[in-house]
Amino acid sequence: MTTQTSTGLRHQTVLLDEAVDALIWRDDGIYIDGTFGRGGHSRRILERLGPGGRLVAFDKDPAAITEAGTVEDARFAIEHDSFAQMAQCLDARGIERVAGVLLDLGISSPQIDEGERGFSFRMDGPLDMRMDTTRGITAAQWLAEADERDIARVIRDYGEERFAVQIAKAIVARRGQSGDRGPLDRTSELAALVAQAVKTREKGQDPATRTFQALRIHVNQELADLETGLKAAFDRLEQGGRLVVISFHSLEDRIVKRFMQALARPEQSAAPELRRAPLRAHELPAPQLRLLGRVKPSEAEVSANPRARSAIMRVAERC
């Protein structure tokens, strides 16, 4: 589904049919779309729900909340918050159990294509990178104040960047200069600085890709939110309920895979002394999730939407 947003920008929802097919197993259930984005998944879910179904969506982005305001459906509700706050928000709505949770962890095309948001290294704009522009510090503010070791750690750990130390040194050195060469506050400045610091090139990838990813993850606490959100989602699932997660880079996918496998194969994640003990079948820890598989976009989808190429969808069902 290509969504024409209220701002006129277009967004192609990744794994649209595959995700909704995996999520909806009864049409009268309560479902969660943890990342409304520009509404592609939410609108398709509403098409599939019966009169008794409900959908609660979450998003930190004010632009997504504006877009959600165009959904005219009494079965739909939107929360201006992270899916990490799912438990509190559902409690406030009196919802104890849900039939399914969908988390699409990708950044939306309008966020990338709108230079003013600060996510893109290809378009000049303020070095912001906040999903929620109403709260928190910007990437520029953090880079202007953070310790060099912290900058290197974030770029290395969240961007898997080999040249993290060199990039961090260049950022801190830039802070000590005066005039127009002072602290970074534009995306184009950061992209140019990284290009000078990164000595080798990966085929088909801009040298700034990993650094921009790392800063976005850090500014928005994406991995911490993911771990909290996965636990909250599992805790709310009813028996037979589905957990569907679409990730776009290896850091996210490792967290999702580890979380699902720990609940599906608890005997493998048990303490070493328990794994070595001679236990009878009824003494083994019972699985709490059943893994339903992993799906990647088809060649046709990637051809139509190159941004889908790194997507991996994992599906599990509560036992």
Swiss-Prot record:
Q: Does the keyword S-adenosyl-L-methionine apply?
A: yes
The answer to keyword S-adenosyl-L-methionine applying to this record is yes
Q: Which InterPro entries match?
A: RsmH, SAM-dep_MeTrfase_MraW_recog, SAM-dependent_MTases_sf
Where found, per UniProt?
A: Cytoplasm
**Molecular function (GO) terms listed?**
rRNA (cytosine-N4-)-methyltransferase activity
Instruction: Look up the EC number in the record and give it.
Output: 2.1.1.199
Enzyme class, spelled out: transferase
Tell me which species this is from: Ralstonia pickettii (strain 12D)
HAMAP family xref list: 16SrRNA_methyltr_H (MF_01007)
The GO annotation for biological process reads:
rRNA base methylation
Cite a GO CC annotation: cytoplasm
Its lineage opens with: Bacteria, Pseudomonadati, Pseudomonadota, Betaproteobacteria, Burkholderiales
Q: Main location per UniProt? A: cytoplasm
This protein's name: Ribosomal RNA small subunit methyltransferase H
State where S-adenosyl-L-methionine binds: G39, G40, H41, D59, F83, D104, Q111
Q: Which domain of life is it from?
A: Bacteria
Q: Which Pfam families match?
A: Methyltransf_5 (PF01795)
Q: Which UniProt keywords apply?
A: Cytoplasm, Methyltransferase, rRNA processing, S-adenosyl-L-methionine, Transferase
Query: Which reaction equations make up its catalytic activity?
Result: cytidine(1402) in 16S rRNA + S-adenosyl-L-methionine = N(4)-methylcytidine(1402) in 16S rRNA + S-adenosyl-L-homocysteine + H(+)
Q: Which family does it belong to?
A: Belongs to the methyltransferase superfamily. RsmH family.
Sections of the chain in a coiled coil: none
What's the stated role of this polypeptide? Specifically methylates the N4 position of cytidine in position 1402 (C1402) of 16S rRNA.
